[in-house]
Each structure stands twice: as structure tokens, then as C-alpha cells.
């Protein structure tokens, strides 16, 4: 299965009639492996900072998580494994795997829990595959 198929079929899938607004799989180096059409353009340093928060949990808390034009307030995640952010009625979930980061962005009517489930389920599968 191509990386794009993982994004299209597993991240952008419908859940209870809703789906993520955008999603991507990005290497630890910030290189995009695959993304949905609406995924925001981002700076390499934004991905570098996300990776740094995985290595040093709490790194993003004082400044927030920036991705493209959006700043998310960092909320409780799983140190070293999952970063979650919130902005208004939407938010972001980032799951770290051995070689990549699975990123999902949502807005109402999708819930944070639905976003977490979609992103973390694919991330866990990739971890099981050694990716």
C-alpha cells in the first residue's frame, strides 16, 4: 500500500459521518511522505519543534504547536508518543512512529476523541510493522 493510500483510506476515512479536515504522514526529518490536499504548508522548523517535543516532553507547552498558519495550544498527550493540540472547536493529533509522524487535523463536528482514534490507530499499526 502506498503512503498516499494510508492517508486517503485510513486517515481521511469517514467516522460516524465525519472525517478529518486534513492529514499527513511526515518523516522525522520533516519530509512529507503523503498528505491530503488540504494539509497546510508548514516550515521545516515546525516539524523540528514537534520532534523536539517528543524527545523533550513539554518543549512546546510554553509557545504552542505551530503548523502552517495555525497555532495550537498543547494539551495532555502521551509523552514521547502522542502530542495533542487544540484551537477553538478544532485541533491536531500527532503520533510518533519509528520513522514517521502521523498527523491529523480536525474541526467540529468531528470530536477530539475521533481524531485521536484515527491517528493513533494508524500510528500503532505502523509501529507494529516496524515503521
UniProtKB/Swiss-Prot annotation:
SUPFAM superfamilies given in the database record: Profilin (actin-binding protein)
InterPro entries, per database record: PFN, PFN_euk, PFN_sf, Profilin_CS
CDD domains named among the record's database cross-references: PROF
SMART domains: PROF (SM00392)
A biological process from GO: regulation of actin cytoskeleton organization
Disulfide bridge map: 13-115
Modified residues (Phosphothreonine): 111
Main location: cytoplasm
Chain's role: Binds to actin and affects the structure of the cytoskeleton. At high concentrations, profilin prevents the polymerization of actin, whereas it enhances it at low concentrations.
PANTHER family: PROFILIN (PTHR11604), PROFILIN-A (PTHR11604:SF51)
Miscellaneous information on this protein: The variability of the residues taking part of IgE-binding epitopes might be responsible of the difference in cross-reactivity among olive pollen cultivars, and between distantly related pollen species, leading to a variable range of allergy reactions among atopic patients.
Name of the molecule in the record: Profilin-7
Organism of this sequence: Zea mays (Maize)
Amino acid at each position: 500500500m502506498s503512503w498516499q493510500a494510508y492517508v486517503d483510506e485510513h486517515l481521511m476515512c469517514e467516522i460516524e459521518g465525519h472525517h478529518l479536515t486534513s492529514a499527513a504522514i511526515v518523516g522525522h526529518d520533516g519530509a512529507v511522505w503523503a498528505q491530503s490536499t488540504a494539509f497546510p504548508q508548514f516550515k521545516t522548523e515546525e516539524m523540528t519543534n514537534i520532534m523536539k517535543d517528543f524527545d523533550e516532553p513539554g518543549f512546546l507547552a510554553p509557545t504552542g504547536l505551530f503548523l502552517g498558519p495555525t497555532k495550537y495550544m498543547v494539551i495532555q498527550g502521551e509523552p514521547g508518543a502522542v502530542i495533542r493540540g487544540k484551537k477553538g472547536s478544532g485541533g491536531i493529533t500527532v503520533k510518533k512512529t519509528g520513522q514517521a509522524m502521523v498527523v491529523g487535523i480536525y474541526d467540529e463536528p468531528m470530536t477530539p476523541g475521533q481524531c485521536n482514534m484515527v491517528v493513533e490507530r494508524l500510528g500503532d499499526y505502523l509501529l507494529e510493522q516496524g515503521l
